[in-house]
């Protein structure tokens, strides 16, 4: 009798949900019992816990990761007429935040080794209108922050971390969320630390900036019915804060499990047609995404899917070729590295609770591909 083939979804929340079921249900019951749903004790408790985790003084909750970046830019006074340098290889929310603030994104190419922005290319992109560098920690690995901060310091620029994919990642022993002037996090459910809905936050050591961000996310109000800014409604609700607080103590263990899976992939995948990602020496990668590259990416995807292996692409169309950013005037060939990554990248299954059999199935399927 033949064995049943092992299927592997691209992602599954079920193992984590089963393990934390009592904690999550307890968090829900606690919020319901308190009968306070916005700006209460759960929000305050999570903000303190996450600030402590990141090693900073302040955490300000908000509605989602995009809002976190928009609030940072607005609180810094960055807007129309200003430029913000950002990587060409990133999720569109990074650049949308710059647009929503009224500033102009200036896209800089990554390195193929890290997928993150190449600091050697940043200097040439700085102009008199540049006000900040948006450093994205893509796929779970920190950008080269020493070089980025040095360039920013030399030109009087702010450094904003887009840490949406890097909860718990470290750079030279310091956690993402403590490496720039103001980092923004997303707690979208699929993140390494995910809510059970949309949520986000900003972390910072800048007292005045934290105060402005909190006000801007609460209709521009510093206290009830007193509005000092033209703000917006972007707050972390009590229920999501309680869920996040229940999951935070498990984040390091869950990241360690991702690192164990990644270590197996890196050690046991030996297909010359598939380029594996790298963990850089100064970084602790938390493997939000395990991104490989293949010249015939679509054939690899078809091969894996036919064997019950789920995949995804991060991201199939680079920002400068999206219709939303036709205004940048950057046609095909303008940013060749971003275009190469978009054409060749494929994301393999990576989630807490993958069984050894599932990990082995992914490894075997990749090794069997004839590219």
What is each model feature region?
Residues 96-98, 151, 175, 192, ...:
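Hydrophobic/aromatic ligand-binding patch that stacks against planar heteroaromatic rings
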Residues 60, 85, 106, 159-160, ...:
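Structural detector of well-ordered beta-strand residues that form the stable sheet scaffold
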Residues 185-186, 200-205, 245:
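Short beta-strand-to-turn element immediately C-terminal to the catalytic PLP-Schiff-base lysine
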Residues 2-3, 14, 26, 41-48, ...:
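PLP-dependent aminotransferase class I/II
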